[in-house]
Swiss-Prot record:
PANTHER family on file: ALDEHYDE REDUCTASE
UniProt keyword list: Lignin biosynthesis, Metal-binding, NADP, Oxidoreductase, Zinc
Note accompanying the cofactor annotation: Binds 2 Zn(2+) ions per subunit.
Name of the protein in its database record: Probable cinnamyl alcohol dehydrogenase 9
Example of a GO biological process term: lignin biosynthetic process
Record flagged with keyword NADP: yes
Pfam families registered for this protein in UniProt: ADH_N, ADH_zinc_N
UniProt record similarity statement: Belongs to the zinc-containing alcohol dehydrogenase family.
Molecular function GO terms recorded: cinnamyl-alcohol dehydrogenase activity; coniferyl-alcohol dehydrogenase activity; zinc ion binding
The encoding gene: CAD9
Record-listed Zn(2+) 2 binding positions: 98, 101, 104, 112
Amino acid sequence: MEQQPKMVTGWAARDANGLLSPFSYPLRAKGDEDVVVKILFCGICHSDLSTIKNEWGNAKYPVVPGHEIVGVVAEVGSSVARFAAGDTVGVGYIASTCRACANCRDGFENYCAGLVPSFNAALPDGATVHGGFSELAVVNQRYVVRIPGGGGGASPAPLDRLAPLLCAGVTVYCPMRRLGLDRPGVHLGVAGLGGLGHLAVKFGKAFGVKVTVISTSPWKEAEAVERLGADAFLLSTNAEQMKAAAGTMDGIIDTVSAVHDLTPLITLLRTHGQLVPVGSPGKPVQLALYPLQSDGKSVAGSMIGGMRDTQEMVDFAVEHGVAAEVEVIGMEDVNGAMERLQKGDVRYRFVIDVANTMARAR
């Protein structure tokens, strides 16, 4: 007799109003290389909000979002050697890649043309991929990272604060590493102080670099310097401050997701300095070319990170005490959290306590 698929509960959006509610669906059958993860916590990324509201026109309803997952291994497939039941693990944005292209071979799976996200997607065999707003996830072992510190949830940092590292953390960590903005003596600018920006500050200080936060909000100065440990704060609407800081930064991680002119940030860079936009404005941004050309400056793209880099980032974060500032919510509060996220009313990342609240939210 054919075995019936296990039914699990997640929270899904059914249409572009983005309202999430309980959704029962069959868990994908475990393959030989798969890990079954009991989800403990899942962060909420702005791309989750954009997807459930179909802002990018690619929503495949019903959508179970979530790609900042921390959990415990419940089962492993017969060919899995890297993980065992009880291991604490993380799952980020990647569910599958081609494994054959140059990017995959070089550890840059995040740039594979065949990348399948860990939510709102389908695997090459047609199986639907649901995200982390759910009880369980089945993930190929290649796209799972180990959370150091022991099994069953033991870790040097609370697991809820590690969940956002699986997307937001690796998004800012990778370009800092790749472009040499992780060395003592470097002056790093961080534009924007939200979910991505506050982690860029934390990683920068863990690397031992000088960090200046650049923001349009004067009230964020105390937050940046006193709470997060930034060395300086630059109010981008203050012409005198911007002029005084011109040509002083080796690189800038631009986390701003709203449409904005990049030229003022370019003026802050030293010769051969690099601007890395990691926010995702919905429309084209403005950039004057001459300030780039006149001093050999550049704009560098970056998107999340490959699996090798993601594991390295998690290991570094745990060793150096880098963790997100979070507001933990129950699954039943997720729609209110999405509304607040739309308004920018979060400091700095929402994380759902999936394991302890899913049952009561059904």
